[in-house]
Amino acid sequence: MSKFGLKNTPQWQGLEKNYREIKKIHLRELFKDENRFNKFSIRDNDLGITFDYSKNIINSDTFKLLIEFVKAAKVTEYAKKMFSGEKINWTEKRAVLHTALRNRSNMPIYVNGKDVMPEIKAVLKKMENFSNDLRSGKWVGATGKKVTDVVNIGIGGSDLGPKMVCESLKYYADGPNVYFVSNIDGADIYEVLKKLNPGTTLFIVASKTFTTLETITNALTARKWLTDKLGDKAVANHFVALSTNVKKVKEFGIDENNMFEFWSFVGGRYSLWSAIGLPIACYVGFDKFIELLDGAYYIDQHFLNAPYEKNIPVIMAALGVWYNNFWGASSHAVLPYSQYLNKFPAYLQQGDMESNGKTINFEGRRVDYGTGPIIWGESGTNGQHSFYQLIHQGTKFIPCDFIGFVNPPEKIGDHHEKLMANYFAQTEALAFGLTKEEVAKNLKKAGISPADIKILTPHKIFEGNKPTNSILFDELTPRTLGALIALYEHKIFTQGIMWRINSFDQWGVELGKVLANVILPELKGQTDNKHDNSTKNLIKIFNSNKK
């Protein structure tokens, strides 16, 4: 990995100087430039997207410095390494090739000297055949009935990605109902199974190793539920596996012909493009799944080929670094103005926070600057009635992404116009706010007494100067959803390179798993291991109050 001392670079120092200057300037002042929107926005007619970043606290000098920072970090060089199969996840000695899963060209991609594209295409073909058979009724359960309900059992990337996509594309769904079970809490699977018929239910068990504690625990519960009603032989007709462990899959009772492979070069949080996306294909159809891949591939090419100054994920990343490292922003809100995208913020939480929640840099040293932000959000307008108060008038500095669509999949009265009126109003209010004079004038016009005006005015001031990006698609389709997901994937990648951290490992999830395995026997009355005073007493209370 190439090295450069981050805080000692002229780009970093230039941005520090620019911050000291621009923090004194309000967006009201910056918008006196009538050409500002044209300077700081991108329109792509082929995809049908407008990316407006003009409501960010930047000027031309800021933007130039941010682009120079990206260049100095050699983002394109690392991107080419990723796309070509080099092992950029060096702590696990793995290639990072989720982009190969949606490679729509005929270009070969090599890992350890082997072209992986034939295998990827073979799995896609297998997914197509299976999903078509399931949806048409050719695949039937043990009782000869068509499958009406699919239950995906997985966790992390084997759950969040396909669940988010199925929810986002619900309008297009014309296949079986799809449910997702992830939590080891028995309530999760109980609430799903109680409304299903074993004879018409198919389970998709998604676990690369087929040993993941939560997933296998839930899968065994599902198998018992099925076999209690239909017998052991029914497993072959009602379970398929997304895994690489043939031995464990066969031991479970699943025919290895019904096992869909994926690879170590695909990280869990980037895996929805792989066989992990099987529930998507079952739900909306394989053709729609391919459209999803097409949209992501379009952004892959944009990311690789567009100049930094016109590169949407690069600009998103650079602005995030600007606020994180120079303005002290510790969180970033993602606010989709579409109920279909209500699971998108939770999906991005894993994608971003598991990727860039790191403290160790390329050289194995602890960083002395902020890295990944806290990602959170809610679909509009629900969030307006809960946490927007804090964004507008609280003490935290929170950059926001507003995601919207010109044309909704459904058309019900003027619902969409009312939704989008709020979308546009919020970014305007956050940017420009209301001054003391404007508040007093409005109160006076409303007939409020001078005494009450004096009391109310400070509470009704909106400082504004809250930065936002507006990501506005012409419509929500499988293709534009794929593009949206890929935009954020490449934003996350770019920030990881700018911060000089590995965005593709996740060692922080391991310690808790190890300790849970130590504690589990204690909750079943076995050996009492040595713990701190707090943990020891909590376990004692748990055991003494069990029924």
Curated annotation (Swiss-Prot):
Sorted alphabetically, the keyword list is:
Cytoplasm, Gluconeogenesis, Glycolysis, Isomerase
* A GO MF label: carbohydrate derivative binding
Recorded GO cellular component terms are: cytosol
Q: Name one Pfam family in it.
A: PGI
Where it sits in the cell: the answer is: Cytoplasm
Pathway as given in its UniProt record? Carbohydrate biosynthesis; gluconeogenesis; Carbohydrate degradation; glycolysis; D-glyceraldehyde 3-phosphate and glycerone phosphate from D-glucose: step 2/4
Could you name the active-site residues?
Answer: E354, H385, K513
- Cysteine pairings via disulfide bonds: none
Q: Which reaction does it catalyse?
A: alpha-D-glucose 6-phosphate = beta-D-fructose 6-phosphate
Biological process GO annotation list? gluconeogenesis; glucose 6-phosphate metabolic process; glycolytic process
The record's similarity note reads:
Belongs to the GPI family.
PANTHER family associated with the record: GLUCOSE-6-PHOSPHATE ISOMERASE
Protein function: Catalyzes the reversible isomerization of glucose-6-phosphate to fructose-6-phosphate.
Under what name is this protein listed?
Answer: Glucose-6-phosphate isomerase
Source species, please?
Answer: Endomicrobium trichonymphae
| Upper classification of the organism | Bacteria, Pseudomonadati, Elusimicrobiota, Endomicrobiia, Endomicrobiales
Gene this chain is encoded by: pgi
